[in-house]
Swiss-Prot record:
Organism: Cavia porcellus (Guinea pig)
GO molecular function: estrone sulfotransferase activity; flavonol 3-sulfotransferase activity; steroid binding; steroid sulfotransferase activity
The protein, known as: Sulfotransferase 1E1
Bilayer-spanning residue ranges: none
Entry keyword annotation includes Cytoplasm: yes
Amino acid sequence: MMDSSEHDYYEYFDEFRGILLYKQFIKYWDNVEAFQARPDDLVIAAYPKSGTTWISEVVCMIYAEGDVKKCRQDAIFNRVPFLECRNDKMMNGVKQLEEMNSPRIIKTHLPPRLLPASFWEKRCKMICICRNAKDVAVSYYYFFLMVANHPDPGSFPEFVEKFMQGQVPYGSWYDHVKSWWEKSTDPRILFIFYEDMKEDIRKEVLKLIHFLGRKPSEELVDKIIKHTSFQEMKNNPSTNYTMLPEEIMNQKVSPFMRKGISGDWKNHFTVALNESFDKHYQQQMKGSTLQLRTEI
């Protein structure tokens, strides 16, 4: 039997096709599954808290050919709709996307096997951004604290245990990143590391420009780097999620743009927690060629 705190924890989530997912998303799943992709759609896929907003803004700037004003006209969650996001009140990713002109940029946290079939049929390009598990766990913990429809995550070590067992929305980080990594041999899929973007943003921006078939210029790259720096995005209402009401995202508890660094896990993991995490990590990632850096 579940104790009351465990019952509270699962109030908003349910097991769905092998992962934990928000009940509201599951309720409207048929609309996601039936979604019709267009050949020029671009999918940005990532496990939550891996740098999705950052790479989305970089891509928006590439599409806008460096026009900052154009990118500031609307919130990132309207420019890059969140495919499977749906609730009874105000959010409907599928509807947003259906009403959008091409080319569309589409955000998802789904693993490849749950992505609507039409994306594969239409041979859409996809960008997957991946971040080291420890920093993701830290960021996810703070996300739980500040976003509505999330239970109390408990203490940080308690939350990390849930994270390790895949008992968080979108399930196991390990399964998620391994499944996208296996897909990345496909030339239509670009796999990008958060840590590489932190270390050499110019190199990664150029990689993205080439992947998207655009012409690079020094001026364009400079504009993108400036506009998508952490400080710029933290202060930009169109990227920092302050356009969402406080009852959805309470940034007084923790800002959406919190630190934007690699290695913040060192400020949260005790030696013992780190040791057990590393042991579990090695078991989960055994046999995978995917290598991530926990610091730069």
